[in-house]
Amino acid sequence: MKNNAQLLMPREKMLKFGISALTDVELLALFLRTGTRGKDVLTLAKEMLENFGSLYGLLTSEYEQFSGVHGIGVAKFAQLKGIAELARRYYNVRMREESPLLSPEMTREFLQSQLTGEEREIFMVIFLDSQHRVITHSRLFSGTLNHVEVHPREIIREAIKINASALILAHNHPSGCAEPSKADKLITERIIKSCQFMDLRVLDHIVIGRGEYVSFAERGWI
């Protein structure tokens, strides 16, 4: 009964002020629904976030880490992973259906949803038309933990095939640090030069890390 009474607080707050008014602890408590013996759901949610550092840390955790939380089993782990996957697919659909790009923030959120948590470097390209509306996006290259081989010709071939006029490049750093390497800068320059011959514009190259990002355009490098 105590857990149910505690849960009414986030629910009532959500109904009155909207879901965005909930704190991370309250949002997680709403999902968990019940606590464990001797621990109400809000306390459990607070401890989980403290253990994992943030919602990001929680949603990207592995089962070995998650199973150490007393009273929380594989079912809740599967549900949390399902939430993360739902978010990724939501941004995937939103990117296709809400063209043109609504804002740099939406682009970044989409890329974070697609690349966060990947164990290998993935190089993605968002293809845009002359009005900067999204045509499609594609994971063109996949590499290792700290390297991905990128071929500008493949990018250009795909752009020509779908009649794209502009590109947004993106890749992830599984290490968590989003700061671009020298190799990242060099391949970006190569892609830009190759695209110029085909009258293709590279609007940005965004590097996704663990809870952080770097935009070449924001840095003034493009």
Swiss-Prot record:
Ranges where the MPN domain occurs: 100-222
CDD domains per the UniProt record, alphabetical: MPN_DUF2466
Signal peptide: none
Gene3D superfamilies associated with the record: Cytidine Deaminase, domain 2
GO biological process: proteolysis
Tagged with keyword Ribonucleoprotein: no
SUPFAM superfamilies tied to this protein: RuvA domain 2-like
Residues annotated for Zn(2+) binding in this entry: H171, H173, D184
Motif stretch (JAMM motif): 171-184
Cytoplasm recorded as keyword: no
A molecular function (GO) term: metal ion binding
Keyword tags: Hydrolase, Metal-binding, Metalloprotease, Protease, Zinc
Coiled-coil region: none
Family: Belongs to the UPF0758 family. YicR subfamily.
HAMAP family assigned: UPF0758_YicR
This protein's name: UPF0758 protein YicR
Organism in which the protein naturally occurs: Escherichia coli O1:K1 / APEC
